[in-house]
Amino acid sequence: QLRYREAVLRAVDRLNEQSSEANLYRLLELDQPPKADEDPGTPKPVSFTVKETVCPRPTRQPPELCDFKEKQCVGTVTLNPSIHSLDISCNEIQSV
């Protein structure tokens, strides 16, 4: 069974794979995990913040050398690694 953080990191990897953006995202902040419970195959709510770098993915430049754009992501992940349930959406964080 995956830990909550591992499941979210997989979600960020999947987000990068499926993203139409030219740049990579990195996990910035992970909100509190749900209470430990029942079936690892049941989708769990998650909330986390990723930052998009301004560096293109093909350069493979270390993201920490790049400036960032920030997005807030919410959705669900499944902690059972054999079930690929992922429902994530991300929006630009509006500066106040």
Swiss-Prot record:
GO molecular-function term, one example from the UniProt record: lipopolysaccharide binding
User: Which cysteine-cysteine pairs are annotated as disulfide bonds in the entry?
Assistant: C55-C66, C73-C90
The Gene Ontology CC terms held by the record are: extracellular space
Q: Where is this region: Disordered?
A: 31-50
Q: What InterPro entries does the entry give?
A: Cathelicidin-like (IPR001894), Cathelicidin_CS (IPR018216), Cystatin_sf (IPR046350)
User: Where is it localised?
Assistant: Secreted
GO BP annotations of the record are: antimicrobial humoral immune response mediated by antimicrobial peptide; defense response to Gram-negative bacterium; defense response to Gram-positive bacterium; innate immune response
Q: Which residues carry this modification: Pyrrolidone carboxylic acid?
A: Q1
The UniProt keywords, alphabetically, are: Antibiotic, Antimicrobial, Disulfide bond, Pyrrolidone carboxylic acid, Secreted
PROSITE patterns reported for this sequence: CATHELICIDINS_1, CATHELICIDINS_2
The task this protein performs is described as: Probably a microbicidal peptide.
The family assignment reads: Belongs to the cathelicidin family.
This protein's name: Cathelin
